Amino acid sequence: MLCGTVTSGSCIAVGAEAAESTFMFTPSATAVDSITAGSNEFRMCFTDPAQGTKSAQYIGEHSLATKVAVLYDSSADYNSGINDAFVAAAEENGLEIVADEAYTADSNTDFSVQLKKIKDSGAELLFLPNYYADNALILQQAHDAGMDDVKKFGVDGMDGILGVENFNTSLAEGVMLLTPFSATSEDEKSQAFVKAYEDANKDEVPNQFAADTYDVIYAMKAAADAAEITPDMSNEDISAAMSEAMLSVELDGLTGKAKWTEDGECDKEPKAFEIQDGAYVEME
């Protein structure tokens, strides 16, 4: 059995080798193709398209804005996948895309041209389906461009922005994001995990990758118990038994209440947070 991999590219490669022979459970590979090689492959996190769709739904349902702009890295599958799904779901959720701006990994330091177009578009909210390093630069340059009144909304890649070196975290005040876990959540389960993680890792604060992995281990244990796995079973038999057992697992984990479909996808609701006073505060 394999807990992993972390990223989509490696997961697709490993999944091709593991198909039907080694049970594989990725905590955080978000590309759709990460778990499509075999029926023995499962995922804890949301797919890229699901993040885009659910973000559009959340923004629309909570009336956060009607005029929305997007700024994303078009050279990365993660960013592009989320963007495409978000744009596709915008209209049915009452959102008008007034600017859809892109950059690439070769031009991810100066966003002035894109931000000017976004500012001129009259956007009320800027959707940022990027990782936190790029988003930190974007927030700084948006502030410099006089765009503090434009709301900012990200996805799980935004998690970690408060820890970016030399980033003025006050610029993240009011930023909203969908992510499955926050180390500042006040529920007993999350706080116990955070304390144990910090104690074991020299006060390093766990992020959603750590929480997803924690949940994967407990979901795998639940499936192994249900399947009555024994050491003398072959890899193929273990894989088949685990795959069948996973369909009956219901996990109340750090990242939410989860169950799984026959195609290995996780069925759970995302959590929305707003950064307030340097901490994540869960939104309704």
Predicted segments with their positions:
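Beta-alpha junction/loop-to-helix N-cap segments that form part of ligand/metal-binding clefts
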Residues: M1-S34, Y103-T109, K259
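Ligand-binding clamshell of periplasmic/extracellular solute-binding protein-like
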Residues: C3-I12, P27-S34, L128-A136, G154-L162, ...
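Sec-exported extracytoplasmic/periplasmic mature domains
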Residues: G15-E20, Q57-T66, V87-L95, K116-A123, ...
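Extracellular/periplasmic bilobed ligand-binding domains
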Residues: E17-S21, A85-L178
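An alpha-beta-alpha
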Residues: E41-A102, L125
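Segments of small-molecule ligand-sensing domains
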Residues: D199-A210, K221-A279
